[in-house]
Amino acid sequence: MLIRSIFFFTILIFSTCLSSNENIKHHYHKNFNQIKKLAQKINIDAPGTFYCGCKIFWKEKKGIPELNSCGYHIRKNANRANRIEWEHVMPAWQFGHSKSCWKKGGRKNCIHDYNYQKIETDLHNLQPVIGEINGDRSNFMYNQFPKSTLNGQYGQCSMKIDFKNKLVEPPDISKGAISRIYFYMSDFYHFKLSKKQKKLFLMWNKKYNVTNWECMRDNLIFKIQGNHNPYVYSKCQKNNTNKNI
């Protein structure tokens, strides 16, 4: 408990510093299509798709996942399975459904809502994924299932989706990054996480350390967007893998 308190106290101080110093130059892009171009620029050297780790072949504005490189098995939608889409790790529904614009006309009706646009276009929350996975995940919440549950839905990609209960367990390779993105989104945009979510993400954050790519990506986003994810940045600094600033 003491260690956990110290961890959050440290992050709180660091987040406060970021809010006061970096918001001055923090900028967002009104058009989601514009932000997708920047996301491609940031992720051009990504080691693979976010959940499954498939290699990505970039062709002009499009990304094509090499499904054989990660043993991915198409579940149902071959068209979307063969293209890269941009996944909101914290789903647009989670940060948008309570807004009046969403209640009046859904996500499309929020395109002129400034506060919504800031959140939707935050590069820290966008990851390149196989399109079919993006569609299947939808706005389902992350969870942890028993090991014997829902195996093999996507071949060797260990993404598990419980469509009935609208829950998803991502592969281990993405759990740490997911936890740190959620904590960032919660702090930066003042979204309250449930006790269950906090417990799960604390476990993932502790168990799965930052990767070199996470640190590189955080630096690239900083150069474009003007702010770090403190939950990534602090660990990178500790590991001496983030040399920016």
From Swiss-Prot:
The keyword Hydrolase applies. It catalyses: Endonucleolytic cleavage to 5'-phosphodinucleotide and 5'-phosphooligonucleotide end-products. One of its GO terms (molecular function) is deoxyribonuclease I activity. The keyword Oxidoreductase does not apply. Coiled coil: none annotated. It holds the Pfam family Endonuclease_1. Its EC number is 3.1.21.1. Signal peptide: none annotated. Keywords: Endonuclease, Hydrolase, Nuclease. Disulfide bonds: none annotated. Transmembrane segments: none annotated. It comes from the Bacteria. Has double-strand break activity. Belongs to the EndA/NucM nuclease family. This is Endonuclease-1. It comes from Buchnera aphidicola subsp. Baizongia pistaciae (strain Bp). The lineage of its organism: Bacteria, Pseudomonadati, Pseudomonadota, Gammaproteobacteria, Enterobacterales.
